[in-house]
């Protein structure tokens, strides 16, 4: 069996080697010639999966080790009869930790009490749910907006989009969709940006394109935190230069998230092939407990991981892709023992 794998997939040799012959290629370099003889294709977000890539191939299984789906033509895969799996939820804890860590750092920067602020969470799926749980532990009031989920589950504790946009802190965690009853493409745009004021802290840790950047750069906010960009890796210099934190789409890049992305695809491939799983694969991320000797939450979180280093790394925007590919080691909070109680939910 021949496997073509994006070489940025975590521990791909250790996890997938026993399935067959591996060809590892940079995701942006995977093309029709690369996959024409492959049986399995395992990717991240930089490979466009469509008819152009696959029309001359024999690929039977495609696994994506990331959450985003806007680079996948799922309708074409269905017509071709190609099995597809995406590692949904693999990075949800990492993104929630990114948002909470940034809010805690902003407390000192802007001198506010987060327990007196409202947090508007737009998109309450895997990430939004975990973020809401952490916010509750910290005493932050949340305003939850997710029309598809609200309708599907008949939830009465959700709010409309304009109410969520009026929160003190607004953060987006939707997928990027352009069709359907509730498309998220340019969800925040010239028609509703007036709800965002010069007292709003605004996050995009969802997908580039959820916020219309040509409008965003014209509006004054209290602080912008931007991890996802419309035209990655060509990020908007005006927004980058005025942001409190501008990072290269790494909110979900914890070691745990990258491992789970690969592991979830491994599980799906085992199921597809009818193979028994190797229980030792899970041991690739087993760690001894790590200790931190800090006396407050901000210092503890920054000792675990200081996201400002990510912003500093892409002051030269040409470093965007290289930095993502060679991202520093970052473990999630549950690995750490600390004097300070961490909002682990």
Curated annotation (Swiss-Prot):
Transmembrane segments: none
GO CC annotations, alphabetized: cytoplasm
Binding site for NAD(+): 146, 174, 227, 252
Enzyme class: oxidoreductase
Organism: Ruthia magnifica subsp. Calyptogena magnifica
Record's keyword terms, sorted: Cytoplasm, NAD, Oxidoreductase, Pyridoxine biosynthesis
Cross-referenced SUPFAM superfamilies: Formate/glycerate dehydrogenase catalytic domain-like, NAD(P)-binding Rossmann-fold domains
Positions annotated to bind substrate: 45
EC number: 1.1.1.290
The protein's name in its UniProt record: Erythronate-4-phosphate dehydrogenase
Catalytic site positions: 207, 232, 249
Subunit structure, as described in the record: Homodimer.
Gene name per UniProt: pdxB
Protein's job: Catalyzes the oxidation of erythronate-4-phosphate to 3-hydroxy-2-oxo-4-phosphonooxybutanoate.
The family this protein is said to belong to: Belongs to the D-isomer specific 2-hydroxyacid dehydrogenase family. PdxB subfamily.
Main location: cytoplasm
GO biological process, one term: pyridoxine biosynthetic process
DNA-binding keyword on record: no
HAMAP family: PdxB
Reactions listed under catalytic activity: 4-phospho-D-erythronate + NAD(+) = (R)-3-hydroxy-2-oxo-4-phosphooxybutanoate + NADH + H(+)
PANTHER family assigned: D-ISOMER SPECIFIC 2-HYDROXYACID DEHYDROGENASE CATALYTIC DOMAIN-CONTAINING PROTEIN-RELATED, D-ISOMER SPECIFIC 2-HYDROXYACID DEHYDROGENASE FAMILY PROTEIN (AFU_ORTHOLOGUE AFUA_1G13630)
Domain of life: Bacteria
This protein's pathway: Cofactor biosynthesis; pyridoxine 5'-phosphate biosynthesis; pyridoxine 5'-phosphate from D-erythrose 4-phosphate: step 2/5
Location within or outside the cell: Cytoplasm
Gene Ontology MF term list: 4-phosphoerythronate dehydrogenase activity; NAD binding
């Amino acid at each position: 069996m021949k496997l073509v794998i994006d070489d940025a997939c975590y521990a791909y040799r250790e996890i997938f080697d026993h399935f067959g012959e591996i060809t590892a290629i940079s995701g942006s370099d995977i093309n029709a010639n690369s996959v024409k003889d492959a049986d399995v294709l395992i990717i991240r977000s930089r490979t466009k999966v469509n008819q152009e890539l696959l029309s001359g191939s024999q690929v039977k299984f495609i696994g994506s080790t990331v959450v985003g789906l806007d680079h996948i033509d799922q309708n074409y895969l269905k017509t071709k009869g190609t099995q597809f799996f995406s590692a949904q939820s693999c990075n949800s804890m990492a993104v929630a930790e990114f948002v909470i860590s940034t809010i805690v750092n902003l407390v000192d920067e802007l001198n506010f009490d987060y327990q007196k602020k409202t947090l508007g969470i737009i998109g309450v799926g895997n990430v939004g749910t975990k973020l809401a749980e952490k916010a509750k532990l910290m005493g932050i009031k949340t305003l939850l907006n997710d029309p598809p989920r609200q309708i599907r589950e008949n939830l009465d504790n959700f709010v409309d989009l304009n109410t969520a946009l009026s929160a003190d802190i607004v953060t987006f965690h939707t997928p990027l969709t352009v069709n359907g009853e509730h498309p998220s493409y340019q969800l925040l745009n010239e028609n509703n940006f007036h709800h965002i004021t010069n007292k709003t802290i605004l996050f995009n840790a969802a997908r580039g394109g959820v916020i219309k950047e040509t409008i965003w750069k014209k509006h004054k906010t209290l602080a912008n935190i931007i991890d996802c960009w419309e035209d990655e890796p060509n990020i908007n210099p005006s927004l980058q230069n005025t942001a409190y934190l501008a990072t290269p789409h790494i909110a979900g890049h914890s070691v745990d998230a990258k491992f789970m992305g690969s592991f979830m695809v491994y599980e799906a491939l085992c199921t597809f092939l009818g193979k028994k799983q190797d229980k030792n694969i899970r041991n690739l991320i087993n760690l001894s407990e790590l200790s931190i000797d800090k006396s407050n939450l901000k210092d503890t979180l920054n000792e675990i991981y200081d996201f400002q280093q990510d912003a500093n790394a892409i002051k030269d925007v040409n470093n965007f892709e290289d930095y993502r590919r060679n991202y520093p080691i970052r473990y999630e909070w549950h690995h750490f023992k600390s004097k300070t109680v961490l909002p682990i939910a």
